[in-house]
Amino acid sequence: MIGFAVFSSFNRFTTIFVCVLLCVVYLLSYASGEYDGRDSSSGSNNDRAPSNEFGSCTDGKCIKRTSQDITSGMWFGPRLGRRRRADRKPEINSDIEAFANAFEEPHWAIVTIPETEKRQITQFTPRLGRESGEDYFSYGFPKDQEELYTEEQIYLPLFASRLGRRVPWTPSPRLGRQLHNIVDKPRQNFNDPRF
């Protein structure tokens, strides 16, 4: 019984260890296989010299690298933003391709319909719902004094009068006390020198 418990825990430990080891080996072979699969002619397509295939030059100082240095950097994965070569042509859905072909070769016929004048051209004059009897070319000048007097009588004052006053111009008391004589208001203090 004790032997079975020891054997089962040993068996679990070895199984887990073997699985982890296989995963690490697989990941390392996948990461290094990406760089081993490159063709060597890509280095000659650059403007680099063939003797400096694995070197990097900055400010005229070239550092020689070996192939082991390149694969040792793969522990951290490929560079971010690195793009892979896309040799394959992107696949296009057949429905999208048929739709694009329909737009490239239009089978549409453009038909123009002659315009017939159904509406009459009218001059729009806004009147706010009622007819005004004003002459359009009078420019608001009265022809004589009678017309001026009748226009003043017709129109109501623009502002409501204060406290029932009907005088055309009522001065404010702040304009000066000497204006009381204009409206014929009696003085309240006859002895006051300010009046």
UniProtKB/Swiss-Prot annotation:
The modification Pyrrolidone carboxylic acid is found at Q120. The gene is PBAN. Keywords: Amidation, Cleavage on pair of basic residues, Hormone, Neuropeptide, Pyrrolidone carboxylic acid, Secreted, Signal. Residues 34-63, 86-117, 131-153, 178-195 form a propeptide. The lineage of its organism: Eukaryota, Metazoa, Ecdysozoa, Arthropoda, Hexapoda. The keyword Hydrolase does not apply. A hormone that controls sex pheromone production in females and pheromone responsiveness in male. Also mediates visceral muscle contractile activity (myotropic activity). Belongs to the pyrokinin family. It comes from the Eukaryota. The modification Leucine amide is found at L80, L128, L163, L175. GO terms for biological process: neuropeptide signaling pathway. It is found in: Secreted. GO terms for molecular function: myostimulatory hormone activity; neuropeptide hormone activity. This is PBAN-type neuropeptides. Residues 1-33 form the signal peptide. PROSITE patterns: PYROKININ.
